[in-house]
Amino acid sequence: MTIKRTNDIARIIMFVVTVFTVALFLLPMLYGISGSLKTKEQLSSLNQSPIPQSPKTFEYNGKKCELFIVPIDGVEKTLAIIKKGRDESVFIDPENPGAGQIVWEGKWRTLQNEWEFDPQFGNYKKGWKSINFLLLFRNTLFYALITTFGTLLSSTFVAYGFSRFNFRAKGKLFIILIATIVLPSAVTLIPVYTIFYKLGWVGTWLPLIVPHFFSNAYNVFLLRQFMLGIPREMDEAARIDGCGPIATLYKIILPQCVPAIISVGLFHFFWAWNDFFNPLLYLAGHPEKYPISIGLSSFSNMYSTETHLVQAVSMIACVVPFLIFVVAQKFFMQGVVVSGVEK
């Protein structure tokens, strides 16, 4: 086997694995989109189709009759059932109603329906009216944007310090900072909640916002990795031109860190948009401050039997993060690769 043939086989295998992996990750989203366009009955049916569709009907004597595929004399015909019976049923040929009624012996429940594509776009309109989306979107955007600003501001300064300055115990401090990534949040949950409770912050936005203005280890790591790739000669040139540390950060470092900053910002924005536990813990009893994650949970509990509406409002909630990712995808991928996440 030649080297070229081996490489071709490897590429084919890689392509197949990639397609399978992408399909695996997209499957829940595709199911959600499909379910949001179905009726309640279609979702609860054991024989539901992957796509939204409903049985075809034919109007006969002012009544809508379902179409079935009926075997007659060894030939399958599409007929409309006008009278259902236990052992025999009466059908009519929709292409030739004047030919009269057709009596078919057998159990009609064993027959297959004739289906047609029938998406229920009204689910989105009904779901939108059933929940205060504008309030939920406003609260979620406020929470996501202000915490994204806070984490970018603090993480940038900390990463700049670790990547550009030498100080005592620098390595040990960085190791301690990174070690907090593996620290389970449950370990600090009770002490942190107690502190916020005694400060009188429970029931306000402060416990959700203030901590993000004190850096994040994961974001610091990503930004530091990116900054380490910027030549130090540029810092020296800026210093010769009279720039201090802050001016160097603003004029030299930040313009070159745009991809990494966008990546970190998107990571945090998506996390804040989907954050459920923290708002549930600190905003309990204040529905006017609920973000969309809590709103969807409450909606799901209220409309637990209306699965199609739950999936419709869930798809609506995904629109904003999806659009943001599409717009910033180029910078996001560049920042992820250069900062070392890909590796």
Predicted regions and their residues:
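A structural signal for multi-pass alpha-helical bundles of membrane permease subunits
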Residues: 2-343
